[in-house]
Design a protein with these regions (language model features):
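Non-catalytic, surface beta->alpha helical segment in thiol-disulfide oxidoreductase systems
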Residues: 61-91
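Chalcogenol-based redox active-site neighborhoods
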Residues: 9, 33, 50-51, 76-79, ...
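Structural micro-motif
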Residues: 51-60
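Short alpha-helical
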Residues: 15, 43-46, 76-79
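Local sequence-structure signature of Cys/Sec-based thiol-disulfide redox active-site neighborhoods
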Residues: 1-31
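Thiol-based oxidoreductase modules, predominantly thioredoxin-like and allied folds used
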Residues: 9, 32-46
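Short, well-ordered secondary-structure micro-motifs
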Residues: 19, 47-50
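Hydrophobic alpha-helical membrane segments, chiefly transmembrane helices and signal peptide h-regions
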Residues: 24, 60-61
Length: 91
């Protein structure tokens, strides 16, 4: 598993999802070994329900061991995403 894994939960008609995607994509570009997995909540409804995803966008940040270290509903900024990544690297 990557040192930091970002999961982005989106939907097709979610305006803020574009902002969230841009912020997370920039963070992945800046963090060596980071990865991004995007989930469409319509096509992956079971996973969204299992992880208690209630709104889009939702960003989940996981450490290298797979533990969730941060979750945010809404569109985060790049500095917020980088701060969350720092938590994942410390975990």
């Amino acid at each position: 598993m990557p040192a930091v894994q970002f999961e982005l939960f989106t939907s097709a008609f979610c305006g803020p999802c574009h902002q969230a995607r841009a912020a997370v994509t920039e963070a992945v570009r800046l963090i060596p070994g980071a990865s991004l997995v995007e989930h469409d909540v319509v096509h992956e409804a079971g996973l969204a329900e299992q992880l208690d995803i209630r709104t889009t966008p939702t960003v989940v940040v996981r450490s290298g061991s797979g533990s969730e270290v941060f979750r945010a509903a809404g569109a985060p900024t790049v500095p917020q995403v980088l701060a969350a990544a720092g938590r994942a690297l410390e975990a």
